[in-house]
Amino acid sequence: MFTESMLFLLLFLLLGLIAKNNSLIIAVAVVILLKLFHVDGKAMELIQAKGINWGVTIITVAILIPIATGQIGFKDLIDSFKSAAGWIGLGAGIAVSILAKKGVGYMAVDPQVTVSLVFGTILAVVLFRGIAAGPVIAAGIAYMAMQLVAFIK
């Protein structure tokens, strides 16, 4: 029961509790329950392979809700392009989306980076009162940094 992987998960759970990061606490608890109930490897592989896409879909739904409820309309979209902040927001949204795409690809090629990204995010939340922006974007930044390192070599 107390394997290395379980101890590792418990460490993340403890850090999530210290950081008061509900997303991490819930995620670790779900994975621990899957492990305790001996959910088969195929189900775990499916979650690992498709989980990020499922998460992106849920985030996209949440982003679209203000449009569906009428809180955001075409007037708001047009007004956003009348300010520097609107254009900067557009550029930032595009950049983050591209970084996230690169991050998903990078995590698939180098899964070990996921652990350090999650751990780094947790440390920033605990030590610097940062906000967990997500390992996908962090992986995209790591990807860009690794591309820069490869270019310099």
UniProtKB/Swiss-Prot annotation:
InterPro entries from the UniProt entry: UPF0756_TM
Nucleotide-binding listed as a keyword: no
GO cellular-component term (any): plasma membrane
Membrane-protein topology: Multi-pass membrane protein
Cellular location(s): Cell membrane
Superkingdom per UniProt: Bacteria
Signal peptide feature range: none
Transmembrane regions: 6-26, 54-74, 80-100, 117-137
Keyword Repressor tagged: no
Keyword entries, A-Z: Cell membrane, Membrane, Transmembrane, Transmembrane helix
The family this protein is said to belong to: Belongs to the UPF0756 family.
HAMAP family: UPF0756
Protein name: UPF0756 membrane protein lin1603
UniProt organism field: Listeria innocua serovar 6a (strain ATCC BAA-680 / CLIP 11262)
